[in-house]
Amino acid sequence: MLRFGIKTWKRSVLAIRRSSTAPHVQIISNLQKKLLNELYSLRRLVDDNSPATIRVGNVSLLLSKSNIRRRIALQALSSSAEDVACVKQITHALLAAPFMPESKELKYAMDHNGLNPLYISFGTNALFERNARYSTSHLFLPSDFLQVNNLEIIHLPPGTVDSDILASCHARYICSTSYLRMTSSDFTTADTLVLDIDPKLHSLLKNEKSIIPVSSSAALKATKALQDDPHNFQNYQNQWEQSGFQQLRTNMTPTSDLEICKRFLNYLCCSFSLTKAEKDLVRATEFSNSMLISIEKWAKYCDVDLQEFEKKLQKFWKNFGTLKLYSNIESLPASLKQLIKDEYLQKSKLELSFILGELSKNGDDKNNFELAMKDFGTFQNSRMSAVDQALQPLRRKTLYTTAFQGLGALGSLYLYFVSHFSLYNAFSVFSVCGVFGLYYLQSSYRSWKKEYWKELLEEGRKFERQLCRNVFGRSSFYVQQKTAAEKKEHISLIMKKLTKTLDLMKEFQLQSSFSDSPTASKKQLL
């Protein structure tokens, strides 16, 4: 009876525990869904080809997969024999471990590695075996090589670009004869792993605290010493510890999935810092402001003596010193200098088009200046045609006035000779007709001149505004300022998403720690 009571009590306790933990598990599941949604929106915000997208994809993978592959990509910096040998040397060093004989399969695969990536997996995993892409150039090795289950090293030939490979790698190493640069492994620090091959690098290692010596040659030497003398394990152990290779091995095996996720997200926060975007925006604004100030200063030199023009121009740009566009005016073509003197300084206020065009050459758009000059040439041609068209009614009115004066003169002569008027009366009639004709001509000329200059001024101002708009719109300064402002707004939105995701991560970790069996919960949910 006592045994029956104990069993009944155990069932009751288990039932109460299940009923009490069920809502908690549901909370954790909901938090996981929210996290995945936030990460999905982050992936849509960032550029598809940027490393940030790869990292966001990795975070989503870490939260959605229960069995995670540790993947490391090794790639030569160039196709030189030294860099390729460097990759092979590092691969052999990664595979070096106590009491492990040299793998003939690995040696054959490394020697015959061609254009395709070489995959080296540790341990047996059904995921590897089911994947068709690993049917070729894939090597399975025992899991006790690095004492890490589910580890995979990818040997990439130079120039290999495979987003699928890199998207699922925890670390990617660009290998050269003198250094091994780790682009994404420990996301809290930016470490550069240097091979102890070049003696010149010792001074660099002393001054830079962020550089970790790997000494893969020492690791290989220790392994070779152990193979030559299997009984002298102490010698191997000393050389292995001196090589510092165990530290690299430890860094490649993160502790927990949640820690990896937090590292990813914290690294994203550092990557999407608003500091760079704000600096770009301020720099672009300063460039644009200095551009406008230089134009205003330039306009003050329109009435200078033409003989002193080149000297003052050189002095102006030398004192201004920011853009240094006309630091050597003698390098300008003679036709351009003459055009500046004759057309723009003497006859027109549109010398600003030259400055706008030249300033735009400070950017990448070299055709901007030519386009501005084409626009100005088109405007000059249209202005000349406008003058011709405006002169047509004046010519007609002048012809009418001349005809009116002629008729008056003929009438006065007719009256004098036929009607025997006095010469005084005839001259009076002629004078009256002439005065009326001149008055008509003068009034029409004034109205025409007023209307013509008004139209010409409006047309000139309209063209200048359009020219400035076109040149500024094509200018790299304007584009840079606009891009920086958009980038700042975009990064601000990403930072808000990241902050929200990190808050969800903290809550997720907190709720997971409250469960009865955190390990089981993580295994179930992750």
UniProtKB/Swiss-Prot annotation:
Keywords, comma-separated and alphabetical: Chromosome partition, Meiosis, Membrane, Mitochondrion, Sporulation, Transit peptide, Transmembrane, Transmembrane helix
BP term (GO), one: meiotic cell cycle
Topology relative to the membrane: Multi-pass membrane protein
Transmembrane segments: 398-418, 421-441
Cross-referenced Pfam families: Mmc1_C (PF23868)
Any single GO CC term annotated in Swiss-Prot or TrEMBL for this entry: mitochondrion
Keyword rRNA-binding listed: no
Subcellular localization(s) per the UniProt record: Mitochondrion membrane
Chief location: mitochondrion
Record's signal peptide: none
Function of the molecule: Required for correct meiotic chromosome segregation. Appears to also have role in sporulation.
Name of this protein: Meiotically up-regulated gene 99 protein, mitochondrial
